[in-house]
Amino acid sequence: MRLLSLLSVVTLAVASPLSVEEYAKALDERAVSVSTTDFGNFKFYIQHGAAAYCNSEAPAGAKVTCSGNGCPTVQSNGATIVASFTGSKTGIGGYVATDPTRKEIVVSFRGSINIRNWLTNLDFDQDDCSLTSGCGVHSGFQNAWNEISAAATAAVAKARKANPSFKVVSVGHSLGGAVATLAGANLRVGGTPLDIYTYGSPRVGNTQLAAFVSNQAGGEFRVTNAKDPVPRLPPLIFGYRHTSPEYWLSGSGGDKIDYTINDVKVCEGAANLRCNGGTLGLDIDAHLHYFQATDACSAGGISWRRYRSAKRESISERATMTDAELEKKLNSYVEMDKEYIKTHANRSS
């Protein structure tokens, strides 16, 4: 495991065989736009992201269902559970389902039920990963994928065998987006062509991982919303990078859901701060509203209560943080990221 300290950030970045600027420049040269098909898919696949919150224990053969109008099109399409799975250690959950109307196999992962706990107690540890040389991945996200990878992979294989002409899609909201990214990357390596759709996903790993996933065959659609704080974490200064491109819903945030295609701004680059990454604030409503209420079918919704049962002293201390203190902390990360990118760019010029 790599424990990344703030003092080691510059050394880590300079030692990287693929610099931030080189990778960002290469991606910036690509012409990326949003088609009406893309936009329609953004609005559709978030329904699967929402459905994962209330179908992760559904039996095989059951229809995907959501309360709170969480997945109306998925339901009307007759999507059927192939397998569901939960991780007792990490709390990850999700399902694999077939959609006979769209002729698709969807593997979907839910996010954290208590997003405040995650924001408050986030660690920045990275583990080595085997996807590519120099690959580093957030240890928590890797542990979550490891816990359910066998079940998810077997379910996708079973669904493909029964429906060989169906397209495969990996979907996730919030922390589920991070796991969907790892699932998609690993399934592709295993020979399963697929597209990845994530909503409000945090950064998953280092430059090498971000470059590897972004350059795999298959669509990569990472959607962010206004000032959602989750995609700004873990910070760039701790060696984390995003997959590219980013599709940013550049509206007012909050509980806004009526976005149009003209509201979508595309930003390229693993370390870009031109879209969501450069925003400030603690707009949790933006995290919970991607074209709809993403927690509509979760019993009681996604919690914003403080963490009260920490077992580690360091976690317990952070758990006493007020919302104002948490917002200040997250804003400080963004400012440090901006300064880091500015300084690194000046050294490269």
Curated annotation (Swiss-Prot):
Q: How does activity depend on pH?
A: Optimum pH is 7.0.
Primary place of residence?
secreted
Give the sugar-modified residues: N346
* This protein's UniProt keywords: Glycoprotein, Hydrolase, Lipid degradation, Lipid metabolism, Metal-binding, Secreted, Signal
InterPro entries named among the record's database cross-references? AB_hydrolase_fold, Fungal_lipase-type, Mono/diacylglycerol_lipase_N, Sec_MonoDiacylglyc_Lipase
Q: Which family does it belong to?
A: Belongs to the AB hydrolase superfamily. Lipase family. Class 3 subfamily.
Parts of the chain that traverse the membrane: none
Enzyme class label: hydrolase
A GO CC term?
extracellular region
Q: What about temperature dependence?
A: Optimum temperature is 35 to 38 degrees Celsius.
Which lineage is the organism of this entry classified under, starting from the top rank? Eukaryota, Fungi, Dikarya, Ascomycota, Pezizomycotina
| Substrates-to-products reaction catalysed | a monoacylglycerol + H2O = glycerol + a fatty acid + H(+); a diacylglycerol + H2O = a monoacylglycerol + a fatty acid + H(+)
**Which residues constitute the signal peptide according to the record?**
1-15
Q: Say yes or no: keyword Lipid metabolism present.
A: yes
Protein name listed in UniProt: Secreted mono- and diacylglycerol lipase 1
Q: Which domain of life is it from?
A: Eukaryota
Q: Kindly list the biological process annotations in GO that this record carries.
A: lipid catabolic process
Question: What does the record say about the knockout?
Answer: Leads to reduced extracellular lipolytic activity and to reduced virulence to both wheat and maize. Strongly induced the deposition of spot-like callose patches in vascular bundles of directly inoculated spikelets.
Q: What is its EC number?
A: 3.1.1.-
Q: Where in the cell is it found?
A: Secreted
Gene Ontology MF, one: hydrolase activity
Q: Which residues are named in the active-site annotation?
A: S174 (nucleophile), D228
> What regulation of activity is recorded for this protein?
Ebelactone B, a known lipase inhibitor, represses the lipolytic activity of FLG1.
Gene coding for it: FGL1
Q: What does this protein do?
A: Secreted lipase that acts as a virulence factor that represses the vascular callose deposition of the wheat by releasing free fatty acids. Has a substrate preference for p-nitrophenyl esters with a carbon chain length of C14 (p-nitrophenyl myristate). Does not hydrolyze triglyceride substrates.
What does the record say about induction? Expression is induced by lipid-containing substrates and repressed by glucose. Expression is regulated by several transcription factors including MYT3, SAS, and gzzc258. Expression is detected 1 day post-infection of wheat spikes. Transcript accumulation reached its highest level in 6 hour old cultures.
